[in-house]
Amino acid sequence: MSSIDKTMKFNFSEEPFDQDIKEILMTVHESLQEKGYNPINQIVGYLLSGDPAYIPRYNDARNLIRKVERDEVIEELVKFYLEQNRETK
């Protein structure tokens, strides 16, 4: 079996960034709303592309979101979604 056929295991370190990421996302969301943007579309655009132009400089939102890696933000979003929807099964 070639290495292309094997499933890779992706491990995140257990860092205490959960609260930081939440606070950053909430600040970025509020900044986007205040500037009249659709926050979900803009955040998704940033997470998919890595282009910080999706996030305004307003309230230092662009610098804040760049303090955490995009994969860490996605990890937190997936964990939150799964935890919230586990109970509704």
Curated annotation (Swiss-Prot):
Record Pfam families: IreB (PF06135)
InterPro entries: IreB (IPR009309)
Lineage top rank: taxon: Bacteria
Alphabetized NCBIfam families for the sequence: PRK05473.1
Family: Belongs to the UPF0297 family.
Protein name: UPF0297 protein OB2008
Taxonomy of the source species: Bacteria, Bacillati, Bacillota, Bacilli, Bacillales
